[in-house]
Amino acid sequence: MSKGKLIKGIAGFYYVEVNKEVYECKGRGILRKKKLTPLVGDYVEITVTDEDNKKGMIDDIFPRKTELIRPTVANVDQVIVVFSVTQPDPHLSLLDHFLILAETQNIDVVICLNKLDLVQREDVAELVGIYEKVGYPVILTSQNDSIGLEQLEKVLRGKTTVFAGPSGVGKSTLLNRILPHVTLQTGELSSKIARGKHTTRHVELISLETEGWVVDTPGFSSLNIDFLKEEELADYFIDFEPFAKDCRFLSCVHLNEPICGVKTALKAGQLVQSRYNSYLQMIGEIKKNRRY
């Protein structure tokens, strides 16, 4: 038996890399009995059934440290959330949705702001400052003149990384620059509606020369957070945490309660209004979904 990493799954076939060799595998019936479904990113134990043709069977799945639902990927170390600084303009509420979802999975986040060549650096300074103050690393990139690509490559080394973000922001183009040995399909950006066409067909791990892995995922127009309760949401806004301890009530959801540390910090300029606006929007989504 050999231990490998599942890098792709299509139509019941699982492609597992073992010592730089890729084996086409099927899952044994015991996995179904255990109600285990192999996921891209899983570490698995396989038996090689045909070395010449690189065929095998998956015997077992090792415990997962993380599991994303959308995209469905296991054992992710970090999420790089890619947004463009223009064309399309960054949607801060959507960005915050990505951040909250990553926080609920306890996965590290790096924010990548792409298409820097289309604006002046000082034009994005405020946006960068907002999220660096919250505590998220921010990388500025441009695939057209290689700005930030070396910094991005360093962040990827030795880790399994999900690239996420809305369509049209340049995820696949960035990856094509970082991974010259792989060509990912890119879509045209519709100038009429400033929203890219979905081009990624399936989830796949791509090997890095620096002993890491990346996943290119479909762009998202929304993220579902209805699994959270109203009183839980603020726990994942990491910039709220220092001020929430000053709330009178432990159950404070930072809306209309008296003596709310978060609202006080907001009025004092210690919290950013756009982040609180995102919080209010998400609270509204959770309340709406609870009614149905």
UniProtKB/Swiss-Prot annotation:
Keyword annotations of the record: Cytoplasm, GTP-binding, Hydrolase, Metal-binding, Nucleotide-binding, Ribosome biogenesis, RNA-binding, rRNA-binding, Zinc
Localization of this protein: Cytoplasm
Chief location bin: cytoplasm
EC number: 3.6.1.-
Cofactor: Zn(2+)
Entry's Gene Ontology BP terms: ribosomal small subunit biogenesis
Residues that coordinate or bind Zn(2+): C247, C252, H254, C260
Record Gene3D superfamilies: Nucleic acid-binding proteins, P-loop containing nucleotide triphosphate hydrolases, Probable gtpase engc, domain 3
Transmembrane segments: none
Cysteine disulfide partners in this protein: none
CP-type G domain mapped to chain residues: 65-223
Lineage: superkingdom: Bacteria
One example GO MF annotation: metal ion binding
Keyword match Metal-binding: yes
Binding site for GTP: N114, K115, L116, D117, G165, P166, S167, G168, V169, G170, K171, S172, T173
Cellular component annotations (GO), alphabetically ordered: cytoplasm
Pfam families in UniProt: RsgA_GTPase, RsgA_N
HAMAP family, per the entry: GTPase_RsgA (MF_01820)
Family membership: Belongs to the TRAFAC class YlqF/YawG GTPase family. RsgA subfamily.
Assembly description: Monomer. Associates with 30S ribosomal subunit, binds 16S rRNA.
Name of the featured protein: Small ribosomal subunit biogenesis GTPase RsgA
Organism: Alkaliphilus metalliredigens (strain QYMF)
Source organism phylogeny: Bacteria, Bacillati, Bacillota, Clostridia, Peptostreptococcales
